[in-house]
């Protein structure tokens, strides 16, 4: 049995938690290790028993962690674990953003690569980035990886000169789903724009337009459900703010759902929706995959890049241009055609191609 270290955004974010679920369930005979906070005791929905969550909460671990930080070697526990395992799978979406933590993130990955040797990157997009130096630094890093599979063509084009670079549609397109259910509510995934760099100035317009859309949907005879994908990124705060803007007499038509680690429950909530208004990236992907009409509100290029890859010709808005966020535009959108979804699911499987080969090798 091979043993693999998972590097993921372990913050009880539904999209990233689904990556972990899909990885563990696909490779039932592989033992996976994930460093996470104690909140991950609440993670539910992985149908296999092959994930060991390592918590940095014992006294000895805290001492080691502090020593590592003191000598400029943060995440030393991760390094030591990578050294004793068969490989590292870095699975996630926006995991290569140039920001104040870029240098430290790169050092950690470089050490993981040196210790873990067999390093796989699945489901990612590259950027946003500001400097060619950042891109060149990762060009050299990717060259040493066992496999790199991006989730959009834009990122692939940046590094396609490397033989080990591939791309497919988002991994979540290939998630095995329950039978489609026609629901009676419109599901909104809502974010707090001010929690993201560069969007605090549009927050008032964003909430006002969501309020108007909510009231118009209620007026049309449908109920509404506000859904949080990640408490840590202030989705719940955003929902409470929007609810406070809506007249109390309309609250009986509105419910809310806060994701706190139960993936199957969250997927059922999404599956029971009539349609989806998606600011969250994976609300958009899951809405598409569940054959729902989706109205995307793009907060980054990663969303518009994926829409372009899907040749999406329907209505959507962006945080940079909210003019199209209206009931008239929303009600025009339809579910994606079945042939596009089948192709997207097949493309999503591509991310696992090289990892399949590696984990199925004898020895």
Task: Tell me the role of every PLM-derived stretch.
Residues 1-363:
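Active-site anion-handling motifs in enzyme catalytic cores
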């Amino acid at each position: 049995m091979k043993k693999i270290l998972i590097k993921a955004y372990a913050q009880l974010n539904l999209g990233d938690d689904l990556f972990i679920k899909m990885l563990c369930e696909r490779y039932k005979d592989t033992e996976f290790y994930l460093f996470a906070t104690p909140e991950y005791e609440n993670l539910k929905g992985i149908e296999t028993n092959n994930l060991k969550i390592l918590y940095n909460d014992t006294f000895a671990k805290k001492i080691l962690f502090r020593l590592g930080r003191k000598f400029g070697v943060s995440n030393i526990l991760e390094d030591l674990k990578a050294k004793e395992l068969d490989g590292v799978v870095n699975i996630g979406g926006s995991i290569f953003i140039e920001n104040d933590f870029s240098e430290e993130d790169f050092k950690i990955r470089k050490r993981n690569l040196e210790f873990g040797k067999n390093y796989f990157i699945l489901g990612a997009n590259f950027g946003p980035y500001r400097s060619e130096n950042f891109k060149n630094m990762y060009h050299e890093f990717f060259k040493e990886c066992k496999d790199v599979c991006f989730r959009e063509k834009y990122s692939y084009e940046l590094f396609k000169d490397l033989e080990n670079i591939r791309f497919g549609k988002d991994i979540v397109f290939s998630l095995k789903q329950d039978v489609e259910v026609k629901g009676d509510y419109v599901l909104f995934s809502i974010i707090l724009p001010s929690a993201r760099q560069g969007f605090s100035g549009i927050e008032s317009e964003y909430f006002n337009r969501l309020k108007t859309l909510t009231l118009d949907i209620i007026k049309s005879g449908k109920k509404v459900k506000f859904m949080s994908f990640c408490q840590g990124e202030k989705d719940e705060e955003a929902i409470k703010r929007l609810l406070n803007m809506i007249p109390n007499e309309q609250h009986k038509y509105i419910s809310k759902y806060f994701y706190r680690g139960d993936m199957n429950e969250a997927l059922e909530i999404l599956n029971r929706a009539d349609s989806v208004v998606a600011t969250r990236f994976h609300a958009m992907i899951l809405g598409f995959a569940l054959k729902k009409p989706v109205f995307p509100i793009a907060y980054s290029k990663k969303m518009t890049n994926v829409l372009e890859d899907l040749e999406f010709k329907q209505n959507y808005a962006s945080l940079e241009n909210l003019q199209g966020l209206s009931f008239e535009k929303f009600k025009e959108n339809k579910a994606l055609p079945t042939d596009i979804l089948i192709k997207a699911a097949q493309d999503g499987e591509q991310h696992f191609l090289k990892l399949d080969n590696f984990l199925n090798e004898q020895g």
